[in-house]
């Protein structure tokens, strides 16, 4: 195992971004950015041993800080996903967060994702990043430090560990926003990739994709991924929790899950290459997002690739969206 560092580029007003490359003994490697403690690439073999990059991203570091391009690969904090009306209360005190998506907050306002993180520790097979947010920054209480540790193994396991510390009672919902395309060919949509989600319920949403406080059953609906099947089989079916033309952007409630219990949440499989990915988590939910909000004409990605509509699927482990405001949802 080895770790190498290189300069990735410069972002005005933020500084230089570095990439840390962790290579295992079999030649597979991951590249991690100081920008947003993000994943720049994951290069793993297909069934014939050929390496391919299975995540979307950019050659130009400045593209990563454009929120319209989907938070590619970036860590998200303080609070991932949605907060209705950009506010929540703790012990009777109301806190107001940025309205960066209409009338509500998305991904805590984006600060954690679009800033350069410190490198706290580097080992033979891991890198740990940290970011500090002062009390009341973006409306969140507490002097708050978040660390993200990435460890890569010879078995091609990428482990992500989040630690959050605050000197006041606060909220936290960290996740990672990497988009996967196991074909390693971004000209192919993720509609032909196979997905299984170990969940029989999802959080119901309104027309703005904000949780209503109800949980829906996946049974006999397009939301059912309890067995492995193609993402594209029903992605365009009309359904109350889906916005026409967007496809999946929904939180699934993992089977009878308790926080801290590590279980398998999802399986992603590409038939053409034989690549198979398991997602394990100790959190209670997973957001499945197929890039339906990305521009259909796309943006230049890495090499000759494109970052565009339905070219990658994000599998974001998390607490349920807007759980700070919904008492029925266990957190």
Question: Could you tell me what each predicted segment is?
Answer:
Residues 52-112, 211, 223:
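Active-site loop/turn microenvironments that scaffold catalytic and metal-binding pockets
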Residues 107-112, 117, 244, 250, ...:
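Acidic/His-leaning functional-site neighborhoods
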């Amino acid at each position: 195992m080895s770790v190498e560092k290189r300069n990735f580029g410069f972002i005005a007003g933020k500084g230089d971004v570095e990439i840390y490359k962790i290579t295992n003994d079999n030649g597979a490697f991951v590249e991690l950015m100081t920008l947003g403690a993000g994943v720049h690439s994951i290069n793993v073999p297909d069934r014939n041993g050929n390496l391919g990059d299975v995540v979307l991203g950019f050659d130009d570091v400045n593209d990563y800080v454009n929120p319209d391009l989907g938070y590619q690969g970036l860590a998200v904090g303080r609070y991932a996903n949605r907060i209705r009306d950009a506010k929540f209360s703790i012990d009777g005190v109301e806190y107001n967060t940025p309205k960066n998506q209409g009338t509500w907050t998305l991904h805590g306002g984006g600060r954690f994702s679009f800033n350069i993180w410190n490198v706290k520790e580097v080992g033979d097979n891991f890198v740990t990043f940290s970011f500090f947010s002062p009390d009341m920054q973006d409306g969140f209480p507490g002097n708050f430090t978040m660390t993200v540790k990435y460890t890569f193994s010879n078995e091609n396991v990428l482990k992500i560990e989040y630690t959050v510390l605050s000197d006041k009672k606060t909220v936290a919902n960290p996740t990672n926003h990497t988009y996967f395309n196991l074909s390693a060919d971004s000209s192919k949509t993720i509609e032909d990739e196979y997905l299984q989600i170990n969940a029989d319920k999802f959080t119901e949403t309104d027309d703005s994709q904000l949780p209503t406080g109800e949980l829906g059953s996946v049974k006999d609906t397009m939301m059912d991924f309890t067995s492995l099947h193609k993402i594209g089989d029903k992605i365009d079916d009309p359904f109350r929790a889906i916005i026409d033309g967007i496809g999946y952007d929904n939180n699934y409630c993992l089977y009878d899950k308790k926080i801290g219990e590590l279980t398998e949440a999802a399986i992603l499989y590409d038939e053409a290459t034989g690549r198979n990915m398991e997602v394990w988590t100790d959190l209670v939910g997973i957001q499945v997002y197929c890039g339906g909000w990305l521009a259909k004409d796309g943006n230049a990605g890495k090499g000759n690739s494109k970052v565009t509509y339905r070219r990658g699927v994000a599998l974001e482990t998390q607490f349920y969206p807007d759980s700070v405001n919904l008492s029925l949802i266990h957190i």
